[in-house]
């Protein structure tokens, strides 16, 4: 399936299609600790805000969005400019077909051009897998070169159950004494074909 997948930058008009991918994660899983599906206008605002500084990519098959991934600030302090937190959501009918890998490869390429050095993923983690949460996301990230660097025990409560959370990290750039300034996504997207 990954041969027929194209990756492009999101636009605010993608909000309805991407929200349709995200909503089942909110309603039926503990993959996100969000309880309520955001409104269309709120979700569109999230896309717009992200794109002012970071990449927000969409995977399509035959012009239909089947997944998305984006980067955001790790923390809101300038010293963290070279670190980002990633999020990824793939339509449940397209999982395990290479869509996530293509999205993350695209993000990593963008973020490397921006001067980002550290990638982080905050992942819900069950002590015992159940119908709401498995360890598949951790496995995906390990396959993509991430490693677990920390955990918060039973910090999320959803569906009358407590879930842990792990932080995973991947270093993609050199840490220099005179680190070049981070370049926002709008400055590099044209040269990357987005």
Q: What residue ranges belong to the model's regions?
A:
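A short beta-loop-alpha structural element at the N-terminal edge
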Residues: 6-18
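Conserved catalytic-core motifs of GNAT/GCN5-like acyltransferases
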Residues: 70, 122-124, 138, 142-162, ...
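Conserved acetyl-CoA-binding loop-helix of GNAT-fold acetyltransferases
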Residues: 96-112, 135-139
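Acetyl-CoA-dependent GNAT
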Residues: 37-93, 105, 110, 114, ...
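Conserved GNAT-fold acetyl-CoA-binding loop/helix
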Residues: 19-46
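Glycine-rich phosphate/pyrophosphate-binding loop shared by adenosine-nucleotide-utilizing enzymes
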Residues: 5, 64-68, 163
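Short, cationic low-complexity segments
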Residues: 182-194
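Conserved GNAT acetyl-CoA-binding A-motif
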Residues: 111-133
């Amino acid at each position: 399936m990954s041969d027929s997948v194209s990756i492009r930058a999101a636009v605010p008009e993608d909000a309805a299609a991407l929200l349709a991918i995200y909503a089942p994660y909110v309603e039926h899983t503990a993959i996100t600790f969000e309880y309520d599906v955001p409104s269309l206008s709120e979700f569109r605002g999230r896309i717009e805000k992200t794109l002012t500084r970071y990449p927000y990519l969409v995977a399509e098959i035959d012009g239909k969005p089947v997944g998305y991934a984006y980067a955001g600030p790790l923390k809101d302090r300038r010293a963290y400019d070279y670190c980002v937190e990633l999020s990824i959501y793939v339509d449940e009918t397209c999982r395990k077909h290479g869509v996530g890998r293509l999205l993350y490869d695209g993000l990593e390429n963008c973020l490397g051009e921006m001067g980002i050095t550290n990638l982080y993923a905050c992942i819900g983690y069950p002590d015992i897998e159940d119908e709401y949460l498995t360890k598949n996301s951790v496995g995906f990230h390990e396959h993509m070169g991430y490693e677990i660097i920390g955990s918060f025990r039973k910090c999320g409560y959803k569906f009358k159950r407590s879930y842990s959370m792990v932080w995973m990290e991947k270093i993609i750039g050199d840490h220099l004494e005179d680190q070049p300034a981070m370049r926002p996504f709008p400055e590099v997207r044209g040269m990357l074909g987005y």
